[in-house]
A protein has these predicted regions:
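Interdomain "pre-motor" coupling segment immediately N-terminal to P-loop NTPase/helicase cores
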Residues: 15, 19-74
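A conserved segment at the C-terminal end of the G1
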Residues: 124-128
């Protein structure tokens, strides 16, 4: 509901009180809502209830937008655009993961497979579901995580940075195996996985199965990371041709020129 242009404004005293009470959403709709209430002869309790419902709904929308922005999602994709039939992840597995019970249990999710097989899309759509349930998500690429470690090493605040990351109930680390892994990135991955162990959920996408992480980072560090990551993890392996490449070859990757 939005304020109608012809609806009389609120009395100044009432508007000021609503500002002091931090009720911006109810204040915005109040003129129109009060006009409707007068015309339809609402009971006073109905007016109060309607204003409170608008405020609660507006706060919910604002908090959701804040969580989405804080998550750092790469594209904004959701399951509204997801085709479960195209994915090589079994449909029952997709459905089970979408319940988010694994996040509630602080379990991990690893999706590994070739590029273009929907790993990032699926993780982002899951992350969107998580924020819609009122929980927080933190999204990183491994390169970004390495940069964070390097930036905080100078003043010895890496541990504090990891603690801040783990304020989120779900931490997503995307696209492992696409680029060479720096020592900072390897350390960042270990630190986050270690700190999250049995306390938060990690969702990870990779071109490699975690068993092959010792090809990307020092064996000792890889072993310790994978041990903690996989102990309580669901592992899904994707396969098949790149969806992006298939769409491009079929002429579906662009809007036709006219």
């Amino acid at each position: 509901m939005t304020a109608a242009a012809g609806a009389p404004g609120l009395p100044v005293e009432v508007e000021q009180l609503m500002r002091q009470l931090k009720m911006p959403h109810a204040r915005t709709v109040a003129p129109e809502l009060l006009a409707t209430a007068r015309a339809q002869r609402w009971e006073p309790v109905e007016v109060v209830k309607a204003l409170l419902v608008e405020e609660v709904a507006g706060r919910g929308r604002s908090m959701l937008a804040t969580r989405r922005k804080a998550a750092g999602f790469p594209t904004g994709k959701t399951f509204a655009a997801w085709d479960p039939e195209v994915s090589s992840i079994p449909t029952p597995t997709q459905q089970a993961l979408r319940t988010l019970e694994w996040v509630h249990r602080r379990e991990n999710l690893v999706i590994c497979g070739p590029s273009g097989t929907g790993k990032t899309f699926f993780l982002e759509a899951l992350g969107q579901l998580v924020v819609e349930t009122g929980r927080r998500v933190a999204w990183f690429t491994l390169e970004h995580l390495g940069g964070l470690v390097a930036a905080h090493r100078a003043d010895d605040t890496v541990t504090k940075a990891v603690t801040r990351i783990l304020r989120a109930e779900l931490v997503v680390i995307d696209d492992i195996g696409l680029l060479p892994v720096s020592s900072d990135a390897a350390e960042g991955l270990y630190r986050v996985v270690d700190a999250a162990y049995e306390k938060r959920s990690i969702a990870l996408s990779s071109n490699l199965h975690p068993a092959g992480f010792d090809e990307l980072m020092p064996k000792t560090l890889a072993t310790a990371t994978v041990d903690r990551l996989l102990h309580h993890a669901h592992v899904c392996q994707t396969s098949g041709d790149s969806v992006r490449l298939t769409q491009a070859l079929d002429g579906k990757g662009v809007t036709p020129l006219h």
